[in-house]
Amino acid sequence: RDEYPEIRIFINREIKKVKLFLKLDINIHVRRGAGAYICGEESAMIESIEGKRGLPRHRPPYVAQKGIFNKPTLVNNIETLYWIREIIEKGGKKFSSKGTKNHPGARSYSVSGRVKNPGVVFAPAGSTVNELILKCGGMLDGHKFKAYLPGGASGGILPSTKGDIPLDFGGELAKYGCFVGSHAIVILSDKDSLADVALNLMAFFKHESCGQCTPCRNGTEKIINIIKNKSKWDKELLCDISEVMANASICG
């Protein structure tokens, strides 16, 4: 992503070192993207890599069948590649001994917001937000834990009373319409307005909508107009718009 130029320099430097050390006769290409949020979706990312506008593709065919340049494509998150190294070095049994029964292993959680020591926390899969707050030194002085985003901008918002829910895919988190996604945890306090947080998130999605699907393109703007009225939200209309956006947009 173009927002992180220093990381691109670092990656290219390390690739040269690895190829020289291991004498690898393979090509590793680092493609620079414009930073569109939608390119986190695998087919949109492939479109961007091909030099086209980052728009999600209709499925089927799936990228495993017809991906980059119409070839079957394996798309991995960098975190998957990171943990593969540990599994190879230390064994699968040791790795799976961490975490919960349904979600073994470890994860890297990016914790930001109203904590004393924000940053990346390596913790067992299925850790709770209360546990992560403790690993970050607790809440900032003068701040009381009020709510949190369990999975970045699109993962939903949960109150502090749900702070003991395991943060991983499916399970209890999904029952509340939330997901852990990128494991980007944002901690909110009693000093934050949740209405302002919701408005800020929707403004982000309006800006980052690729515009390909009308329900998303128009729906984000409509939702913003509704929640700007902080005194009273039309919850029924919000739910209707959200359902249409989810059902009638390619990303879902």
Task: Show where each model-derived region lies.
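Small-residue-enriched alpha-helical segments and adjacent helix-cap loops
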Residues: 3-38, 146-164, 171
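Active-site loop ensemble at the mouth of alpha/beta enzyme cores that anchors a bound cofactor
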Residues: 48-60, 161-179
